[in-house]
């Protein structure tokens, strides 16, 4: 059933940010490789993270969902899976990319097959595959060269590999997560400043929490020595990406919104969204365990580089549609490789609602204008659905098709809006 949004006025609301998807993925993977038992407290339970759980179970990790969180009995770096294991990661690019290197550690003599949805099979992984081969592993593509489905087989010997870094930082994160269990040290060099580099900080932070440091020089040289993760209790922090939709309610509708369960010292790149709203004219107040956004005057257009905050680009774009001057967002070229081509989809949808939008190879410019309702196809992309739901509440008569696609990262999104009296 579709979800229709009607126009709402200023708000005064409080929400709790759901757990971070990025931290949950990494904590689960590391715990599954660790020596001993781990307890992952407050994990995100959503389609993507459940796919990672099931894949790790197929690779031999004992994972139990308990009231306290996920209890994970690690494999001590030796995942054990049946011959011919196939990991169908559906539409979870994070799961497929991060687990590709973990598959190198598996005992299967036939390798591990990683596959996904039709869209997943259009998302390139050739750069990761090349690095895996350089480090001693094997990658065999079953359809198009450089794209899933593929068969990955170890060993992970180690040594030096060079990546480009311009498509996805997840290729680097994938290799880093598996690197402690290589025979020799793993030395990764990145030819260009990687996109979404804040996610590399998340990877490094979780690895360090489980006892394995990553030595790096900026974001262009990473070294991991042979080591072992140690099981532990780990609490997942709140998600700035998901919080952005609530913050955007204050920016688009007026009034104020407080989001709790946010770490002020987080390495999450999507914290930049808060600074963007401040630059556009919103008031930002730091609370004890969260942030309050308040808007009492017009929004102003800005120019901003969102390379480090890719998951909030669409949220910022819909806010920009209601400003009093144009907004240019740069650092967006790699978004074409997400669950949908987010630049093209965002531009097309804003145009359909009345905006003028210019796009180039690495930028999108939104020219505000009179907006009207319409029907939005999110292209099976959770972030498109949630971002345009926010705009729908400002414009009215906006219908989101396939609203259930938000289950990928934020299953309770619509419930949260309903609890705030917005549906």
UniProtKB/Swiss-Prot annotation:
- Fetch the CDD domains from UniProt: EPSP_synthase (cd01556)
| Residues involved in 3-phosphoshikimate binding | 21-22, 26, 168-170, 196, 311, 338
Q: Which GO terms describe its molecular function?
A: 3-phosphoshikimate 1-carboxyvinyltransferase activity
Q: Which residues bind phosphoenolpyruvate?
A: 21, 93, 123, 170, 342, 383, 408
For this protein, the record's InterPro entries field holds: Enolpyruvate_Tfrase_dom (IPR001986), Enolpyruvate_Tfrase_sf (IPR036968), EPSP_synthase (IPR006264), EPSP_synthase_CS (IPR023193), RNA3'P_cycl/enolpyr_Trfase_a/b (IPR013792)
Pfam families for the chain: EPSP_synthase
State the UniProt keywords alphabetically. Amino-acid biosynthesis, Aromatic amino acid biosynthesis, Cytoplasm, Transferase
Q: Which residues form a coiled coil?
A: none
The subcellular localization recorded is: Cytoplasm
The processes (GO biological process) annotated in the record are: amino acid biosynthetic process; aromatic amino acid family biosynthetic process; chorismate biosynthetic process
The Enzyme Commission number assigned here is: 2.5.1.19
Q: Where is this protein primarily located?
A: cytoplasm
Note the superkingdom of the native organism: Archaea
Pathway recorded for this protein: Metabolic intermediate biosynthesis; chorismate biosynthesis
Catalytic positions are 311 (proton acceptor)
How is this protein annotated for GO cellular component?
cytoplasm
Describe the reaction catalysed, as an equation: 3-phosphoshikimate + phosphoenolpyruvate = 5-O-(1-carboxyvinyl)-3-phosphoshikimate + phosphate
Alphabetized SUPFAM superfamilies for the sequence = EPT/RTPC-like
Subunit: Monomer.
Report the sequence similarity comment from the record.
Answer: Belongs to the EPSP synthase family.
Describe the function of this protein.
Answer: Catalyzes the transfer of the enolpyruvyl moiety of phosphoenolpyruvate (PEP) to the 5-hydroxyl of shikimate-3-phosphate (S3P) to produce enolpyruvyl shikimate-3-phosphate and inorganic phosphate.
UniProt-listed PANTHER family? AROM/DEHYDROQUINATE SYNTHASE, PENTAFUNCTIONAL AROM POLYPEPTIDE
Record's protein name: 3-phosphoshikimate 1-carboxyvinyltransferase
Species of provenance? Methanosphaerula palustris (strain ATCC BAA-1556 / DSM 19958 / E1-9c)
- Gene name? aroA
């Amino acid at each position: 059933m579709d979800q229709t949004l009607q126009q709402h006025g200023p708000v005064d609301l409080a929400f709790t940010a759901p757990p971070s998807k990025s931290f949950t993925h990494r904590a689960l993977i590391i715990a599954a490789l660790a020596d001993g038992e781990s307890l992952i407290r407050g994990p995100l339970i959503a389609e993507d993270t459940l796919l990672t759980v099931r894949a790790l179970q197929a690779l031999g990790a004992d994972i139990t969902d308990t009231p306290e969180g996920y209890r994970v009995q690690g494999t001590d770096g030796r995942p054990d899976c049946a011959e011919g294991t196939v990991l169908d990661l559906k539409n979870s690019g994070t799961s497929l990319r991060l687990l590709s290197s973990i598959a190198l550690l598996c005992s299967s003599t036939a390798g591990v097959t990683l596959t996904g949805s039709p869209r997943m099979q259009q998302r390139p992984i050739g750069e990761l595959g090349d690095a895996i081969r350089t480090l001693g592993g094997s990658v065999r593509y079953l359809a198009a060269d450089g794209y899933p489905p593929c068969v990955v087989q170890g060993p992970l010997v180690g040594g030096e590999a060079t990546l480009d870094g311009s498509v996805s930082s997840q290729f680097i994160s994938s290799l880093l997560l598996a690197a402690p269990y290589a025979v020799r040290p793993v030395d990764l060099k990145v030819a260009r400043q990687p996109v979404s580099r804040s996610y590399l900080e998340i990877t490094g932070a979780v690895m360090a929490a489980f006892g394995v440091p990553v030595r790096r020089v900026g974001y262009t040289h990473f070294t991991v020595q042979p080591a072992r993760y140690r099981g532990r209790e780990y609490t997942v922090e709140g998600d700035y990406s998901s919080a952005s939709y609530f913050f955007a309610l204050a920016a688009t509708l007026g009034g104020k919104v407080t989001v709790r369960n946010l770490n002020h010292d987080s390495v999450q790149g999507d914290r930049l969204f808060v600074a963007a709203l401040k630059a556009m004219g919103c008031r930002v107040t730091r609370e004890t365990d969260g942030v309050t956004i308040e808007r009492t005057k017009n929004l102003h257009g800005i120019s901003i580089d969102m390379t480090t905050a890719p998951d909030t680009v669409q949220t910022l774009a819909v806010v920009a549609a209601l400003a009093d001057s144009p907004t240019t967002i740069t650092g967006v070229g790699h978004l074409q490789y997400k669950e949908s081509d987010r630049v093209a989809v965002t531009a097309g949808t804003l145009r359909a609602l009345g905006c003028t939008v210019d796009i180039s190879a690495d930028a999108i410019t939104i020219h505000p204008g009179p907006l009207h309702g319409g029907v939005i196809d999110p292209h099976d992309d959770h972030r498109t659905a949630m971002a345009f739901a926010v705009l729908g509440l400002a414009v009215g008569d906006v219908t989101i098709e396939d609203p259930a696609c938000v289950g990928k990262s934020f299953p309770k999104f619509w419930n949260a809006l309903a609890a705030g009296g917005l549906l």
